[in-house]
């Protein structure tokens, strides 16, 4: 008889938590970053990005596309549990050489945001404390691919 209250509690419906969306935002990816951590606040090492992608895969996270997010917002289909939107800002050249191959390998969708005036231009700008030129950013051909 003492088990009855416990059994009744276990029989109560559990309120489902609506799927949420986590957003991971990246800027630059470098092949090598000295030390055990990434001291450049705007960059992650290629090795750490692989470790993060592996963590997502091995721990039940589901990278989603912008179309998935819009469809969920419009009520057409829900997001999966543990939805993650991967974003890469500023259109750094490393997106093409380091990130894009990893996205294909893991079969992960992603969003890339570019500053079009930085692409194939003569502009020299300061970015993350360094002078940057157009070669540091994606080209139009790379973006089309």
Q: Can you name each region flagged by the protein language model?
A:
Residues 2-3, 145:
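Short intrinsically disordered, low-complexity coil segments enriched in acidic
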Residues 26-31:
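Short polar catalytic/cofactor-binding loops
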Residues 18-21, 33-145:
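Active-site beta->alpha N-cap acidic-glycine motif
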Residues 3-14:
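Sec-dependent N-terminal signal peptides
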């Amino acid at each position: 008889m003492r088990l009855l209250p416990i059994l009744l509690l276990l029989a109560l419906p559990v309120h489902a938590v609506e799927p949420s969306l986590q957003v991971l935002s990246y800027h630059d990816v470098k092949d090598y970053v000295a030390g055990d951590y990434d001291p450049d606040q705007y960059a992650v090492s290629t090795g750490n990005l692989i470790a993060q992608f592996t963590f997502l895969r091995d721990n039940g996270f589901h990278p989603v596309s912008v179309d998935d997010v819009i469809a969920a917002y419009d009520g057409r289909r829900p997001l999966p549990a543990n939805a993650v939107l991967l974003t890469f800002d500023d259109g750094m050249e490393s997106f093409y050489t380091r990130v894009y191959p990893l996205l294909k390998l893991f079969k992960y969708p992603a969003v890339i945001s570019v500053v079009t005036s930085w692409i194939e231009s003569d502009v020299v700008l300061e970015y993350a404390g360094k002078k940057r030129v157009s070669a540091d950013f994606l080209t139009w051909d790379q973006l089309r691919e």
